């Protein structure tokens, strides 16, 4: 393979995956508005072998270094050579907006002024099994909450140091905790941001006992809405109308 084609192959692979994520997040936003459940839509389209299930999970946006960097590299390279990208620009725009979906849901539930409210964050890294917080959704979510007067308590198995010394070092309204349960104490709601394995099957009785209000915002659609409703939780997902959640 020639050098130009090899470079394009690398950029295109990551841009394609980023596109799948943003596309599914776009669909999730439509689902919320028309009364559909994006989780069911995902299962339906994924059963088509031409599509499959890889990278079609809705969420609160992609981060890290590779996807953002390579999408931006293709956009810039195209511009340098006289071509204006359209799909890739939209991929970036959707991803930017998706990181604001959870804060908007919080505001819809608790109001624009979050003074006196505390939110427990599960997960800081842009994905599980890393301490990498580059362009992580948690940064946007936390900053959007604290600028409205909220306090945030955060827990991540690996990324706490990165948050403290770099990505959230100037945010004085963030408290870091040492476990997924201690972070919940006296919080008005829990927000799942990173789908770490240890968050997949938590003790919901313990969660309910520690939270002020049994309210969960799930940025990765990890939990079962009907089960949580039966346990007395208010549960807000990505791509599912709050009416369906209830």
PLM ranges: what are they?
Residues 1-246:
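Structural/interface elements that position substrates and couple domains in central-metabolism enzymes
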């Amino acid at each position: 393979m020639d050098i130009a084609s090899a470079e394009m192959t690398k950029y295109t692979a990551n841009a394609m995956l980023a596109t799948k994520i943003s596309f599914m997040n776009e669909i999730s936003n439509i689902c919320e508005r028309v009364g559909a459940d994006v989780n069911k839509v995902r299962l339906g389209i994924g059963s088509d072998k031409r599509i499959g299930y890889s990278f079609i999970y809705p969420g609160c946006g992609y981060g890290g270094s590779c996807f953002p960097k390579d999408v931006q590299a293709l956009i810039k390279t195209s511009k340098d050579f006289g071509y204006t990208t359209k799909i890739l620009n939209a991929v970036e725009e959707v991803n930017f907006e998706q990181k604001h979906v959870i804060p908007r849901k919080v505001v819809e539930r608790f109001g624009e002024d979050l003074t006196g409210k505390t939110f427990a964050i599960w997960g800081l890294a842009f994905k599980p099994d890393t301490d990498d917080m580059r362009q992580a959704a948690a940064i946007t979510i936390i900053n959007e909450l604290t600028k409205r007067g909220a306090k945030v308590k955060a827990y991540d198995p690996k990324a706490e140091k990165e948050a403290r010394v770099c990505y959230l070092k100037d945010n004085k309204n963030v408290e870091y905790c040492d476990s997924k349960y201690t972070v919940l104490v006296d919080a008005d709601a829990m927000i799942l941001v990173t789908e770490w394995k240890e968050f997949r099957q938590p003790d919901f009785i313990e969660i309910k006992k520690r939270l002020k209000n049994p309210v969960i915002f799930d940025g990765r659609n990890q939990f079962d809405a009907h089960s949580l409703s039966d346990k007395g939780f208010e549960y807000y997902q990505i791509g599912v109308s709050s009416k369906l959640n209830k």
